[in-house]
Every structure is written in C-alpha cells, then in structure tokens.
Amino acid sequence: LVVGAGPGGYVAGIRAAQLGLETIVIEGDKAGGTCLIRGCIPSKAIIHAAERFESLQQHASEGGHMGMSVSGEPEVDMGALVSWKDSIVKRLNKGVESLLKASGAELVKGWATFSGPKSCTVESSDGPINIESENVILATGSSHIDLPFMPCDEEFILSSTGALDLKKLPKRVAIVGGGYIGLELGCALAKLGTEVTVVEGLDSILAIMDKEIRRPLELWLKNHGVVVHTNALARSAQIK
C-alpha cells in the first residue's frame, strides 16, 4: 500500500508492482504530486509563456526587425495562459496514471485514514474502501504553511499554489520570501508586466546558494525593475 502518488509514491508503487507485489496507490488529489501538479511543471510552463511574451514585446518595440512586425502591443490573457498551463498538467497527470496501470498497480482516489499500522479506510467518490496491507509506504508530500499574521485567502494573499492559478494579471505584487519558489514566480510576473517587490528576511536573495549563482539573478532583477528588500520582515498585510 502506497499513500500518495507524487514522485516518491507513484515510482515506489510502479516498482513494487513490477516486482510482483499486489500494489494499491492512494491519492487524494491528482497523480503526479507537487512537482507535476503545483510546482516545477506548471511554474516552468508559465515562465516559458512569460519569456515568449517578453520576446514579443521586444520585437514589437523594434518596429519590424528582420522583416517581421507585430501589429499593436502584445497583450496577456492570464485566464487563457493558465488554461494552457492546466492542459499540460492534465496531459502529464494522465501519463502518470497510465504508467501505474501499465505496471499493474491500482490507483485509488481518495483520502486514507489509518485505524491500525496496516489497516486504513479510503474515503473515495464511490464510498469508503477498507484496505488491509502487509507493507505501507507513506509518501504524503507537503503543503504550504500559512503565516499566522498573513493567512492565505487565495484571492489577495496567495500561496505558491494560488499564484499558479491567477485569472487576472496583477498590476503589483509583493512576494514574501526570496527563495527559488518566490523568485521563479516573481521573474515570470515581471516579464508579463507586473510590478514586483520581493521581501527577504536574510541579507540576500537565495541565501543558501553561492554568490556566483546569486549575482547574475540580482542583476537581472534590477534590470527588470524588480524591487528587492533584504533584512526585512513582513509583519502583516492589509487589503485595500
């Protein structure tokens, strides 16, 4: 029994089934986990779209460079961009489900509650399913943590998950945290035309990384008008 169909869980489930074990993989959301559903894949899709938009803007400003012209100013339809991103995620999600099926592992969608070390009940759309297993792998992944003074409402105060599902492009955004997740989103939004401010509590962005890695990004942020405040702590947020 594998609880969680992320990159740890579904790979473990596939391998167990290939080795001849009767295998069930339980997933409460979608197969693929954080990286595929709400992390690396969707963020890279949005970054790719932002790069295309930035190139269009640059080409439009050059007025017909290389014999090619763009009529009017390029515009972003954020809802359409997110729908395109979702189509990529959906296709890859189906791919993971197909891999599980091909290996002989059974995917059960629902949330597992354990009543004992090797006994659980899954609340699925078809009703409760009781499962007894000889071995259990817990690969439940993680979720964002709300700041007590700045809880996410996913409308004005967004988690990284909510930021990947924007329906409208914000004029301005403040990103709390100068790690790679916040900066990925910040760079994409800056390319799309949003005014971005980054608030970082330590003395530099990407503080755990080498200076040789940080410096090119610091210059990029400066050149793209991204305001970075270091040694600064967010204390609250007000919606006006």
Residue ranges of predicted features:
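Short glycine/serine/threonine-biased micro-segments
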Residues: 2-7, 30-31, 37, 65, ...
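Glycine-centered short loops/turns at secondary-structure junctions
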Residues: 20, 193-195, 225
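N-terminal Rossmann-like FAD-binding beta1-loop-alpha1 element of flavoenzymes
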Residues: 1-25, 174-175, 181-191
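Rossmann-like NAD(P)H-binding beta-loop-alpha module
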Residues: 167-209
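Glycine-rich flavin
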Residues: 14-21, 26-169, 202-206, 212-215, ...
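Residue-level marker of alpha-helix boundaries and capping positions
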Residues: 3, 86-87, 176, 208
